[in-house]
Amino acid sequence: VHVHYRQQAAGKGHLPSWEPTVAVEIAQAIREACPGIIFNQSTGIVGPDISGPVACIRAVKPEIAAANAGSLNYLKVRSDGRWAWPPMLFDNPVEKVAAFLQVMQETGALPEFECFDVGIVRSVDMFLRSGLYRGHPDLNFVMGVESGMPADPALLPILIGLLPAGATWQVTAIGRENVWPLHRRTAELGGNLRTGLEDTFYLPDGRKARSNGELIDAIVGLARAAGRECATPAEARKMLHLAA
């Protein structure tokens, strides 16, 4: 389960929290409710100060933590030509990536390399070849951000061809009607599947999802239609080279 920590005060739940005590409270609740679950922590933060996410990694010790593997101008334009939000740089220079990787190595977290564009996929291979990272490569193709890779299934063979040897991979599909053909093709090509309200509000039939659970039920259906079955937590740990 991929987790973003949020402030717990009334009316503040839309705001992120990097307080370790909050992170531990959330993590404990999830682990108690779902024994054996693989905990995947978000780490995305703008700017050079990564002390908040780092403190949460050290406190929670997630099995997986997001490793944003390159920078991106994070942009979106509305239909009337106005910016959806002020243009921003999601800055992830090599020095920042290296600092996160060091902490993940120290705490035993598997880095999930978040790749927003083709060049970032290629960068992960360079991290391995340069020795910046020496563990199992697990890549997440983030597709559908307007200033990144489009949520186009035709891109998948190209991206798969750029994977480091032995890598596992998955797709985060962002958008509306375009995300489900992408999930379907990911399942057919052997990739891992993920979804949630962070990435889409809509089910394959166009209805608005009422919960993450409805989205998960839909994506499980796609996996089975492609002749695949969902892994148990133990099977997923083995596949991702995580401790049992």
Report each predicted region and the residues it spans.
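Short beta-strand segments at enzyme active-site cores
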Residues: V1-A10, F39-T43, F113-E114, A236
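Glycine-rich, proline-tolerant flexible connector loops at the mouths of alpha/beta enzymes
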Residues: V1-A23, V142-M143, F201-D205
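Alpha-helix-loop-beta-strand connector modules within alpha/beta enzyme cores
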Residues: K12-Q41, V97-F100, M104, I158-G166, ...
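Short secondary-structure transition/capping segments
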Residues: K12-S17, S51-G52, V77-R78, D125-F127, ...
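Alpha-helix N-cap and loop-to-helix initiation/capping positions
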Residues: H14-V22, W85-E95, P150-A154, R207-E214
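Active-site beta->alpha loop and helix N-cap motifs at the rims of alpha/beta catalytic domains
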Residues: P16-D91
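Catalytic alpha/beta core domains of metabolic enzymes, predominantly
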Residues: I64-E198
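Structured C-terminal cap/extension of enzyme domains
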Residues: R122, P157-L162, R184-A244
